[in-house]
UniProtKB/Swiss-Prot annotation:
Residues 81-145 are annotated as: Repeat 2. InterPro entries: AAA+_ATPase (IPR003593), ATPase_AAA_core (IPR003959), Clp_ATPase_C (IPR019489), Clp_N_dom_sf (IPR036628), Clp_R_dom (IPR004176), ClpA/B (IPR001270), ClpA/B_CS1 (IPR018368), ClpA/ClpB_AAA_lid (IPR041546). One of its GO terms (biological process) is cellular response to heat. This is Probable ATP-dependent Clp protease ATP-binding subunit. ATP binds at residues 232-239, 569-576.
Length: 845
């Protein structure tokens, strides 16, 4: 009886005997076999039972409730097999024969138990609300997954199956190919039916994409070359469009030519898996093609279409694409493909014969508004999964924030992921198991351990009492869990805009408060914020903020960049700093600043670095330095630093960016600059001002600044083309820094230094006399504010560094006051009024 049993099946029998002995039973019944199957923890039977929600502890409790423990007698030898168990073993052997298996495994043992209609095991399953027919159905499905065989046309099990494929059987014993309505062996083995999944409501609803689905239907209705391929970036919804077609087929919203069609996704990896010998892969794919031809109502869908190029090819073998080509050209089979733009170019376009057999449908990412509509359609699915309530504001925030801050990915995929993670975050943070439940579970576990110890010491009366106590505790636990589940369903936690912003904050590092701040508030406060960071350039800040407000309110042409500015003026007055602060305030961080040093583009051929090298040249696959960064992060500030150094022909590239808000890279892709702020800096005219001596503290009136403006504007018109200047929103001329401005800059730098010293429990007190001294030392009309940094390093940071290195100064918190000693700065402790550090070295002014 046991000669065909697998090792796992034999192990189940051993475990079943142990369970019988534990329960003091002198027999081996079907209930013990069921417990042995679950205790084994592996195999087809266990997978099926777990999928249906049965675990070992639950089944053991139910067995104990139904039959309890036997009398306290010593059982010698193995327990005897009951008649039902013997019959179940016979049924298991019969099931194995029917399934054409030459072994008896755990799955056959479970099928054998299901045949015993009056057995305890079957009663246990019914008490746990498990339908035996559902168990059998799941076992057959599991076997079909694990025991995939070659299709009849490729089976080598017997000569009869090769000579008469229509009479051969599937792994489950079903006759194949004899009737159109029966299951398709090869397609069933290597694919899954999308139309069937629609009937079972297993697919998410498809919102929008009507034009793409319509084009898909038109191509499928052609007589020849009726094979569409969906091309688009990862995450734009290519597979969703095919699922939308499946939904239309089920709803009969397609032409007569496509009605009653079945849309089956082909799993190419599964088809290749397990092919050991030459010709096996070709036989499998030919079997699929033969079945598609025979039934005539099959549409194949191959996701990642580029994988058919080279798939299965070995020495002397033919790859999948060459096997499919003739049938695709003649229209014998219809295939829908989906792949990315890059993979299509690398693999499909190189094979001209394959390319002409497919008709391209380019899938573009949806807009933010379209993404919000898609999220509305998916909202119910995610609410049910996470048991939360998703607000309308959360949907809008997921679409807008993902578009603006999540880069390198595409809508709607990144917005859906954001909403999904926000729902998971809310659920995890607010729906933890109550403390009472956790305490009760711990109490049950302790009672269980005490019961087992009592059994081990043969204190059976105590064990029986603990068993009854454990049973009561479990009933109480079940009741509390049910109340908790009901409470969760009745009181759904909302997922709002703040929850979505927190997820974006985790991914990008931008504070969530800044993400949720209203755009109008941000724009209204922008001017004041920039004036606090960029000192002495109020006119420039006002001009910039005016232009940005025009763009963001929709008054400006939407096809141009958010703003395009040319910053002119002497060096060191804050041109690059203003660009950096705009990136921080408008787009959340310094990483939103794309800085292009135009001194790297002094040669004409250097333009290829910006857009990408032409095909055939070194670096073509890498793309352009500028275009790739903007494509990955469209919401950004692009800073072209010192444009007067670039070759004049390179400046012509920027005309298209400034006027149309786009630039075509070396791959032919149009890179969108409409959400970017374009800033160019230049020192044009600065040398003329230096020669005339009209810079720095020498300015006496407003008219002097007018003279500077005229000189810089004259130099700008002389160096730059009129068509370039006319495309700019603003040409902003920065003022030379005055003494008051330098003092404010010194204060800002000292505040930064003070914040760094907090790690060492030090604080600085810098009086105005020291500030004036530093301003005098750092004033350089030709260099602007940059010398101030060196002055702070020499007069403040160097002596402070010596303080930090001294062991005696690391003991307690202290506040240091700076004082002037002759022509140097000294530090002394404020509370002790004594010198706490060496003075800085004497430096000549």
């Amino acid at each position: 009886m046991f000669e065909k049993f697998t090792n796992r099946a034999k192990q189940v029998i051993k475990l079943a005997k142990k369970e019988a002995q534990r329960l003091n039973h002198n027999y081996l019944g079907t209930e013990h076999i069921l417990l042995g199957l679950l205790k084994l923890g592996q195999g087809v039977a266990v997978n099926v039972l777990r999928n249906l929600g049965i675990d070992f502890d639950t089944a053991r409790q139910e067995v104990e409730r139904l039959i309890g423990y036997g009398p306290e007698i010593q059982v010698y030898g193995d327990p005897a097999l009951t008649g039902r168990v013997k019959k179940s073993f016979e049924s298991a052997n019969e099931e194995a024969s029917l399934l054409e298996h030459n072994y008896v495994g755990t799955e056959h043992l479970l099928l054998g138990i299901l045949h015993q209609s009056d057995s305890v095991a079957l009663q246990v399953l019914e008490n746990l609300h498990i339908d035996p027919r559902e168990v059998r159905k799941e076992i057959l499905k599991e076997l079909e997954t694990f025991n995939l065989q070659l299709p009849p046309s490729s089976s080598s099990s017997s000569s009869s199956s090769r000579s008469n494929p229509s009479s051969s059987k599937s792994p489950l014993g079903h006759s194949l190919g004899s009737d159109k309505n029966e299951k398709l062996s090869a397609l069933k083995a290597y694919g899954y039916d999308l139309t069937e999944m629609v009937r079972e409501s297993k697919l998410d609803p498809v919102i929008g994409r009507s034009s793409e689905v319509e084009r898909l239907i038109l191509i499928l209705c052609r007589r020849r070359k009726n094979n569409p391929v969906l091309i688009g970036e990862a995450g734009v919804g290519k597979t969703a469009i095919v699922e939308g077609l499946a939904q239309k087929i089920i709803l009969n919203e397609v032409p007569d030519a496509l009605r009653k069609k079945r849309l089956i996704t082909l799993d190419l990896a599964l088809m290749i898996a397990g092919t050991k010998y030459r010709g096996q892969f070709e036989e499998r794919i030919k079997a699929v093609m033969d079945e598609v031809r025979k039934h005539g109502n099959i549409l194949l869908f191959i996701d990642e279409l580029h994988t058919i190029v080279g798939a299965g090819a070995a020495e002397g073998a033919i790859d999948a694409s060459n096997i499919l080509k003739p049938a695709l050209a003649r229209g014998e089979i219809q295939c829908i493909g989906a792949t990315t733009i890059d993979e299509y170019r690398k693999h499909i376009e190189k094979d001209a014969a394959l390319e002409r057999r497919f008709q391209k449908i380019v899938v573009h990412p949806p807009s933010v508004d379209e993404t919000i509509e898609i999220l509305r359609g998916l909202k119910k699915k995610y609410e049910e999964h996470h048991n939360v309530f998703i607000t309308e504001e959360a949907l809008k925030a997921a679409a807008t924030l993902s578009d603006q801050y999540v880069h390198g990915r595409f809508l709607p995929d990144k917005a859906i992921d954001l909403l999904d993670e926000a729902g998971a975050r809310v659920r995890v943070n607010t729906m933890g198991q109550p403390t009472d439940l956790m305490k009760l579970e711990a109490e049950i576990e302790n009672t269980k351990l005490a019961k087992e110890q009592a059994i081990g010491t043969q204190e059976y009366e105590k064990a029986a009492g603990l068993r009854d106590e454990e049973k009561k505790l479990r009933e109480r636990l079940q009741s509390m869990k049910q109340e908790w589940e009901n409470h969760k369903e009745e009181h759904q936690v909302p997922v709002d805009e703040e929850a979505v912003a927190q997820v974006v904050s985790l991914q990008t590092g931008i504070p969530s408060a800044r993400l949720t701040e209203a755009e109008s508030e941000k724009l209204l406060k922008l001017e004041d914020t920039l004036r606090r960071k960029v000192i002495g350039q109020n006119d420039a800040v006002t001009s910039i903020c005016r232009a940005i407000r025009r763009s963001r309110t929709g008054i400006k042409d939407p096809n141009r960049p958010t703003g395009s500015f040319l910053f002119l003026g002497p060096t060191g007055v804050g041109k690059s700093l203003l660009a950096q602060q705009i990136a921080i305030e408008m787009f959340g961080g310094e990483d939103a600043l794309i800085q292009v040093d135009m001194s790297e583009y002094m040669e004409k051929f250097a333009a290829t670095k910006m857009m990408g090298s032409p095909p055939g040249y070194v670096g073509h696959e890498e793309g352009g330095h500028l275009t790739e960064q903007v494509r990955r992060r469209p919401y950004c500030v692009v800073l072209f630093d010192e444009i007067e150094k670039a070759h004049p022909d390179i400046m012509d590239l920027m005309l298209q960016i400034l006027e149309q808000g786009r630039l075509t890279d070396s791959f032919g892709r149009k890179v969108d600059f409409r959400h970017a702020i374009i800033i160019m800096t230049s020192n044009l005219g600065a040398d003329l001002i230096r020669k005339s001596g009209e810079i720095g503290f020498g300015l006496k009136s407003h008219m002097d600044y007018k003279v500077i403006q005229e000189k810089i504007e004259h130099a700008m018109k002389k160096h730059l083309k009129p068509e370039f200047i006319n495309r700019l929103d603003e040409s902003v001329i920065f003022r030379p820094l005055e003494k008051e401005s330098l003092s404010e800059i010194i204060h800002l730098e000292i505040n930064k230094l003070d914040s760094r010293l907090k790690n060492y429990q030090m604080a600085l007190n810098i009086p105005d006399s020291v500030i004036s001294f530093l301003v005098t030392k750092g004033h350089s009309p030709e260099m602007g504010a940059r010398p101030l940094r060196r002055v702070i390093e020499q007069y403040l940071e160097d002596p402070l560094a010596e303080l930090l290195l001294k062991e005696s100064c690391r003991q307690e918190a202290r506040k240091l006051r700076a004082t002037l000693v002759e022509n140097r700065v000294a530090f002394e402790r404020e509370e002790e009024e004594q010198e706490a550090a060496l003075p800085s070295p004497h430096l000549e002014s």
